Amino acid sequence: MSDSENHESSEPGSPARSGRSRRKRKSGGTRNAQYWMVVSSPDNFRKTREHGFSIQGLKSRHRRRVETMRVGDRLLYYVTGRMGFAATVTVASPMYEDHTPIWRSSRRDEDYPWRVHIRADFVLDEADWVPAKELAYRLDYVRKWPPEHWTLAFQGHIHALPRADFSVIEDEISRSSRRRKTLAV
């Protein structure tokens, strides 16, 4: 192989061999955590709870998103039907593929194959879930939709959230958790 076949062109502005331009990674290889919202049915949230909040599977069509998840990323759970925020967790492993049935979908062939191990941060009892309606007006993410259609922000399965929005929701989940502990004393 000649040198020209071995190395990509080093001239500024020249395209990479694949025809796509390539971005250089910042040295150090670290990045800030990403923040995600998992939209889950009550049954699938229950399945995650039954597994001790140790694993989360995501739908097959979301492989690219899940591939960007890293250890230390944060997930929060929005539960449909109840329209409430129920828990926050931290991603504890890189993505892997597993077709063992745990979660259910209306699509018969969906087995949530893209999985990450997780570690629970805050988990609320169902009676303490934080209603999304109470927080929606405070979330930048929700402002993409007209106010009368705020619930559209919670359609789909996995969404990237701004850190500030995640913090607003997690603070309310934490407050709800502390309220429950105070009432129990």
Residue ranges and their predicted role:
Residues 2-71, 165-168, 173-185:
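Compositionally biased, charged N-terminal/linker segments
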Residues 78-84:
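Short, charged beta-turn/beta-strand-edge "cap" motif at the junction between a beta-strand
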Residues 91-159:
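Aromatic- and Lys/Arg-enriched surface recognition patch
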Residues 162:
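Short, conserved phosphate/pyrophosphate- and ester-handling motifs at nucleotide-, phospho-/glycolipid
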